[in-house]
Amino acid sequence: YLVSPAAYAALGAYMFLLILIGFPVNFLTLYVTLEHKKLRTPLNYILLNLAVADLFMVLGGFTTTMYTSMHGYFVLGRLGCNLEGFFATLGGEIALWSLVVLAIERWIVVCKPISKFRFTEDNAIMGLAFSWVMALACAVPPLVGWLRYIPEGMQCTCGVDYYTRAEGFDNESFVIYMFIVHFLIPLSVIFFCYGRLLCAVKEAAAAQQESETTQRAEKEVSRMVVIMVIGFLVCWLPYASVAWWIFCNQGSDFGPIFMTLPSFFAKRPAIYNPMIYICMNKQFRHCMI
């Protein structure tokens, strides 16, 4: 054991709790939305995509981690490590790029940079396809030789290899690609869209350009998406920061807990994304009841 058996037991219990909550609430989100026609709006397609991403993390990642934590190390071999790392990365990236699509949708709908534009079903499907393509562009390369997935932290979960420094082993290019294309760029787009959105909401309120009902509806949707973005950042920024520090300080000594804590902190979006959607969407709650 790298740490005490009690730490592995706590980790297993934590993963069991995430599965116990994450699977039902995400499945409920999918079921209720597909069951009620009035919930099948273009915007909700993107929110459903978040639920699918969370289920990937729950079924492909959390179950594996709970099982390996019972043994105190990653017992599933290279194939299991690749699958766990792939599903965890894919789920996180689908969620991130879905939030990018939601931010762009909110910016276009509220700020109206394109006159008479409506976010249609075709636009939503294009957004879904875009989020999957970008997520796969991050999750697949380690499977085909551009870097690799390895056990990290307490060795119960797998992630991208930020650590190895050896002759003939080049991990710099992929890590830089991932941080720029799959972290900094999407976050920059999100911050730009919501910066413009806040300005537009204040201007519309001051000018009273739209009805009070319309303004209230747009504000509620925007508030829900903003909270999802904040939650994503709270969970993923510690992991990204620690991973970047390890990459920039390869060869430095650090304990297994150093990477384990932010790694498992980053798994919580699978729970809070659907709970935010359920708590802040009155129409969904009405259909659920």
UniProtKB/Swiss-Prot annotation:
The keyword Endoplasmic reticulum does not apply. Keywords: Cell projection, Chromophore, Disulfide bond, G-protein coupled receptor, Glycoprotein, Lipoprotein, Membrane, Palmitate, Phosphoprotein, Photoreceptor protein, Receptor, Retinal protein, Sensory transduction, Transducer, Transmembrane, Transmembrane helix, Vision. Glycans are attached at N171. This is Rhodopsin. It holds the Pfam family 7tm_1. It is a multi-pass membrane protein. PANTHER family: OPSIN (PTHR24240).
